[in-house]
Amino acid sequence: MAGFKTKVTPEIENLTEVCKEHTSLDISLYAKYDVKRGLRDINGKGVLAGLTQVSNVKATKIVDGKEVPCAGSLSYRGYDIKDLTRGFIEDDRYGFEEVTYLLLFGSLPDKKQLTDFTQLLANQRSLPTNFVRDVIMKAPSKDIMNGLSRSVLTLYSYDTNPDDTSLPNVLRQCLNLISVFPLLSVYGYQAYNHYIKDKSLYIHNPKKELTTAENILRMLRPDKKYSHLEAKILDIALILHMEHGGGNNSTFTTHVVSSSGTDTYSAIAAALGSLKGPKHGGANIKVVRMFDDMKKEVKDWKDEDEVRTYLKRLLHKEAFDRKGLIYGMGHAIYSVSDPRAEVFKAYVETLAREKGRMKDYALYSMVERLAPEVIAEERRIYKGVSANVDFYSGFVYSMLDLPLELYTPMFAVARIVGWSAHRMEELINADKIIRPAYKNVLEPAVYVPLNER
């Protein structure tokens, strides 16, 4: 790329070593000054940094005056996620729009409120004239998340009142972004697929009478066709990813950036940058790729001993990416169980049966059962380990024929709702910029003139 240097030269390599030499910290100092690395204690529990009413993530209970692990639970505005998803399934209806209303406004809508709100979102589900051509199709990104961030920041220029942080204006902006995130994500992928992978280009308009999940599948597929089961399970997947407390990295980023008084587009773009990180939103891609490697290495998928041996090789950095991790296992908060994974699993088997993927499902189930045992045998752990939401979400997306490049953007399509609820909460309740402290651990230096160095 002319004019923009993209190669790491020997000079840059040398400067990197200089930077490392003078920047690396003695890790023993964290304990000395009682600094919680990653803002978490030794058990993974986060440092209390704020208050919220948006959602509650629970993984412990008090027994005989002591805090002990329990089955994980997740509630949105006080409503258990299992009850919410069960209600949508039993009524055979979609829930994304209803849960969006719940998270933003704090209560479940009645029929009229839901109809009006769904129509409001549908009416805003369009992009500025020529936005797809002039923004999304120009210089498409190799990573859809970066393209999504660029699109969000560019929408600032199309907003006639972008910097107004009054609550009605911020709510308007949030609802607009919630409505168009599916378009930005799918169209971003279509541009990538055409200009970078040299595939045919399909741009389908959304239909107002369809739900978010239905429109995603319609816009993504060349023939615009999908089954009712596919759309329902994608709807459930989106609901499970919509919100997860104020302390997860991208939502905390939303709080931090919102506290500065900046505009909505900048705050959401910052959250997207956080979510892109493989330690946050990209984990389900790792799970799928790990299983792809496992299927090549394990000859008999039904042989527990062979699967167990592969899992041990993962932990010993002898398989897959050699990072020593079994992806999809363990969570910063949950230890006994991740309620989102439990909800997912209830529908995964049904979809696997429809898609002819029962052999894959059996392997996933075996790994879910064996991995905690292997980790307990091979590692010193401070709490239990169980499958997290990423363990099954990648498998679900693969059965829905979603390309890997869209896995994290689908996370964003869901989590924009949670970010919006937390941005509103921050603006309504907080009046101070978030500004924690860092302890300096370097001794003072005496200045030396240039000609004496």
What is the role of each PLM region?
Residues 2-453:
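Non-transmembrane, aqueous-exposed alpha-helical and coiled segments at domain scale
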